[in-house]
Amino acid sequence: MEDFSFEARVLNTPYEKADVYHSLSMPVYNTAAYEFDSAEDMEAAFCGRTTDHAYSRITNPTVQYFEDRIRMITGAMGVTALNSGMAAISNTLMAIAYSGANIVTSRHLFGNTYSFLLNTL
């Protein structure tokens, strides 16, 4: 896929995971929780010992497909999709800053960004 043009990668990124209803395109999984065969399987998923989806705020098939598709299209090493502006801002700031770091900013920021900087970092 790397040899294809950007447009070809966008249009031809395959849907490789068949769902139980044989959908031709990736279905939207609008659920919060997932069923497990046993308590041990559930524990393994929540502890990250498997790639199973455990809870949609952590991951779900739709978001994983989107991240994989963006990674394939762009050639990025990894992609993290977030579902709100504040999630994107807080994740970015936590990746580049640390507690006690000096950050110069205005009070006029998106949502609770100023409060996040003041009280969390």
Regions found by a protein language model. Give the residues of each.
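Short conserved active-site loop signatures built around small residues
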Residues: 1-29
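Fold-independent oxyanion-binding glycine-rich loops
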Residues: 14, 32-33, 84-85, 93, ...
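Structural motif
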Residues: 27-28, 78-80, 101-102
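Conserved N-terminal alpha-helix of the aminotransferase class I/II PLP-enzyme fold
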Residues: 33, 38-87, 112-120
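Alpha-helix C-terminal capping segments
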Residues: 72-73, 91-99
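Conserved PLP-anchoring active-site segment centered on the Schiff-base-forming lysine
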Residues: 95-113
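Active-site catalytic pocket residues across diverse enzymes, especially alpha/beta-hydrolases
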Residues: 96, 120-121
